[in-house]
Amino acid sequence: NTVIVSKEIPRPTPQEISEIKRSNYTSGDQMLLGLACNIQYGANPELQRILHKTFVDVMLAESQKEGENLNRLTNRAVYLLCWMRRYLPKLFINWKSPEIGCFIYLGGCRNENEALFMSFLGRLPLDVLILCPDLNIKCCLEDKLLYEVNYPESLAITEYPEESSQVKIGTAAYHAERELDTL
């Protein structure tokens, strides 16, 4: 199961945000436990346990950052839950361990919310591939679990090529052969 996102991860819609159950919180721990109740995968208890633990771990790490206030942390958690509801059903349809899906993101994380979501996905039984072909656009994600490969060449690609007709690549030998065919 593969999900491909190009350019940016669309922000949660007001409707998606309103579907997240929340209340007034007085502490970060209370907020995390309250919001974690939104993670429901009843058909697969193992997956629900993994998602719940990963959500709490990632948000606890986020709460340790200097200067994080409760409202900002709550907003980040709500964004994370909205994106989970949007993408995880596609990634984990009929999931059984040790199967893994793949989340491909072309363009790189542009803000802290996207970076948090990618960090969250990277801790799930998923492959996460973040492609940043344009060296002028920097990815703001920094994660100790991230395996990073950088190349000196830059390529201005805005959309992930989903159809083979969009990709036109040939070797020098191939092009020389085609040129000889026209003579």
Where are these regions (language model features)?
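Active-site and donor-binding regions of nucleotide-sugar-utilizing enzymes
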Residues: 62-150
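Conserved N-terminal ligand/cofactor-binding loop architecture of enzyme catalytic domains
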Residues: 1-79, 147-183
